[in-house]
Amino acid sequence: TGQFSNDYIKPFSITFIHFVACVADIALGLITFLPFLIFMYFSSFKLITLPSAQNALLFIITLILAMVMNFFFNLIFHAFTFHHGDRRSLIELINFVTSFIAGSMFPLAFLSGTIKNIFMALPFKYLFYVPIEVFLGKMTTHQITLSWLTIIAWSVMFFVIYKIVFATGIKKYEGTGR
């Protein structure tokens, strides 16, 4: 469609443009979901225990860091489209597998043995499992700080990989479209 070409020639970084779009998409989803959350709370407030203000703040910070890490991870695969063409279905499959490994479909605490060790060694636990543990107050401040540092380290690594893949791919890019 030429959308990438249009974004690429703008005076802003293409990464920044896509980051702002990602944040806007998440904000829209949150705004859309908020009335449902409010309804859920008021219809069952006796069953729901809200976290302390400190845990809520730590949870929000953890979510923001996890979102940034996931953004850079996804950018790597989007940058590979320079080399291999449009692979939206592959990217969706990768997102599904990532969500599964991250614990979005079941708590990683249900796992045991080698599988749990593998899932816990991967960075994807920081997308769902760790934020939920923070929300529930199951992590100490020290563990949360270590998690944040680990998320930042993974984010930097994913960003560097993305920049390398993007730099090699943009050399092959031939803008077409509008």
Set out the residue ranges of the language-model regions.
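Membrane-spanning helices that line or support transport/gating and their immediate boundary helices
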Residues: 2-3, 72-79, 83, 114-117, ...
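Juxtamembrane loop-helix boundary motifs flanking transmembrane segments in multi-pass membrane proteins
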Residues: 4-15, 48, 52, 89, ...
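Helix-terminus/helix-capping segments at the ends of transmembrane helices and short amphipathic helices
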Residues: 8-9, 81, 102, 170
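Alpha-helical membrane-protein architecture signal
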Residues: 12-24, 53, 57, 61, ...
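Hydrophobic alpha-helical transmembrane segments of multi-pass membrane transport proteins
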Residues: 1-37
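Transmembrane helix segments
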Residues: 47, 77-78, 82-134
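Alpha-helical transmembrane segments and their short interhelical loops
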Residues: 26-84, 144-153, 157-160
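Junction motif at the cytosolic side of a transmembrane helix
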Residues: 135-138, 150-178
